[in-house]
């Protein structure tokens, strides 16, 4: 047996124990095995997770382990799992070990990077807070993202998480000329498939790299896929000096797969059955998502909240890292207002006069106050009707309804379905529009003119057309 070869001594589902004669592979080192199942040649990559003593290691498989038997020869790679990086990954789908899985010509990468890397040091990190303009009115106004920040995207099934993700990818590609990386962490294969074809239709595929480790895969693949995607994003930040957008769908599944791996490795669980290292594992991933003096990685992470319990250790460990939250609300979607972002529930760390300026802060808080007052008046309106309100309250209700409508916006990626052309609204236009509504400049314009438009100029044109017709 060659020095770097070992043999399998035990297979426990996705966990494989291997014994080496003289060589001891390091933690996180990759192991390779080629074997045959029912006449089909298969290759499997494993990652060393623990040293058991006496040249024995316990490794986590990155794919199914059926067909493995004891005494099979397994080879240490002498390095970690490495994945392709660079512009050649754009428009392609990869699995956790960096193989293309989109049935196109297999990629022969000219450059690969290991998936486990150090987070940027304090000296490398950029400390200035800069707003990241998305072109989506409700986000830029009420819960702005910061460059290199982390955003939690909360929402149930079918309220439009994917559409917002696609619109952000589109806007980053066309307005900031940047790239995006999408990591599908333990989500449905069907959703991954839909996303690929929707991106193809929406024309954003050539600006994004997709990495999928879906629900049906072993915990090792579901956990490490987040690092695969992050490594691709880090290349664009560190080597190309770009501002990259990184999507993780779903960050809860990263914690969940970590809990499965932890149990398989025989570690004693902590609260609610999660791994004892939950906070550390979450930090290891999140700390790599940062702004450096070269470029930035801004991440949008979809967060599934099990049983709507925000105190569950997994979502709670994510909250500690988030700079902004974008909450999608089904009630808003039912009104036909898209994006269905809840203007009162969504938050941002940078929504303060020091960070975004006095004007933006005043307009944003003014809008929230009007919407909150409208929410408080809902019960009175339901019981007594609008006529019983004071003149001032009637004005508040009118303005709030206009604001609600004006928070809707036609998306570029939804053009195919809605037929209305998408709109990118600059922050300047957003502030001008909402500031004008608060000042009462547009009290004479019917509220329907505010629905599904971009800037306030379009509202005025729409109102003019409505009047003429």
From Swiss-Prot:
Role this protein plays: Produces ATP from ADP in the presence of a proton gradient across the membrane. The catalytic sites are hosted primarily by the beta subunits.
Signal sequence annotation: none
Binding-site residues, ATP: 155-162
Keyword Transferase: no
Intrachain S-S bonds: none
Organism: Helicobacter pylori (strain ATCC 700392 / 26695)
Protein name: ATP synthase subunit beta
Alphabetical list of NCBIfam families matching this protein: atpD
Gene that specifies this protein: atpD
Reaction equation(s) it catalyzes: ATP + H2O + 4 H(+)(in) = ADP + phosphate + 5 H(+)(out)
Leading EC class: translocase
The EC number(s) this enzyme carries: 7.1.2.2
Membrane topology, record value: Peripheral membrane protein
């Amino acid at each position: 047996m060659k020095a770097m070869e070992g043999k399998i001594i035990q297979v426990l589902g996705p966990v494989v124990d291997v014994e080496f004669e003289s060589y001891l592979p390091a933690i996180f080192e990759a192991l390779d095995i080629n074997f045959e199942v029912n006449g089909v040649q298969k290759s499997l990559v494993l990652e060393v997770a623990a040293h058991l003593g006496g040249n024995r290691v316990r490794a986590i498989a990155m794919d199914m382990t059926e067909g493995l038997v004891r005494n099979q020869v397994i080879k240490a790679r002498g390095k970690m799992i490495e994945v392709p990086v660079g512009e050649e990954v754009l428009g392609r789908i990869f699995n956790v070990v960096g193989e293309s899985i989109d049935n196109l010509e297999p990629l022969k990468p000219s450059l690969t990077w290991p998936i486990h890397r150090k987070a940027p040091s304090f000296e490398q990190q950029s400390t200035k807070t800069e707003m990241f303009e998305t072109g989506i009115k409700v986000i830029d106004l009420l819960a702005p993202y910061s460059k290199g920040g982390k955003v939690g995207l909360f929402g149930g099934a079918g309220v439009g998480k994917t559409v917002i993700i696609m619109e952000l990818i589109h806007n980053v590609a066309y307005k900031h000329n940047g790239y995006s990386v999408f990591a599908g962490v333990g989500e449905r294969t069907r959703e991954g498939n839909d996303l690929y074809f929707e991106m193809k239709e929406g024309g954003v595929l050539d600006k994004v790299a997709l990495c999928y480790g879906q629900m049906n895969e072993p915990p090792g693949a579901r956990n490490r896929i987040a690092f695969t995607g992050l490594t691709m994003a880090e290349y664009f930040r560190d080597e190309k000096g770009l501002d990259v957008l990184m999507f993780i769908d779903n960050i809860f599944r990263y914690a969940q797969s970590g809990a499965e791996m932890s149990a398989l490795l025989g570690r004693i669980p902590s609260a609610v059955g999660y791994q004892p290292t939950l906070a550390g594992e979450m930090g290891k991933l999140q700390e790599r998502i940062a702004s450096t003096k070269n470029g930035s990685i801004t991440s949008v992470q979809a967060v599934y909240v099990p049983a709507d319990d925000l105190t569950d250790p997994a979502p709670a460990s994510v909250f500690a890292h988030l700079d902004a939250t974008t909450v999608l609300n089904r009630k808003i979607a039912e009104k036909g207002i898209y994006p269905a972002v809840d203007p009162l529930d969504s938050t941002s760390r940078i929504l303060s006069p020091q960070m975004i300026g006095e004007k933006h802060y005043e307009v944003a808080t003014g809008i929230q106050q009007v919407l909150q007052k409208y929410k408080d008046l809902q019960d009175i309106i339901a019981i007594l009707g609008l006529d019983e309100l004071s003149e001032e309250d009637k004005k508040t209700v009118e303005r709030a309804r206009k604001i609600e409508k004006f928070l809707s916006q036609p998306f570029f990626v939804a053009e195919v379905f809605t037929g209305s052309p998408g709109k990118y609204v600059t922050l300047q236009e957003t502030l001008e529009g909402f500031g004008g509504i608060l000042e009462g400049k547009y009290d004479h314009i019917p509220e329907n003119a505010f629905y599904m438009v971009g800037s306030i100029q379009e509202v005025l044109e729409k109102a003019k057309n409505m009047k003429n017709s």
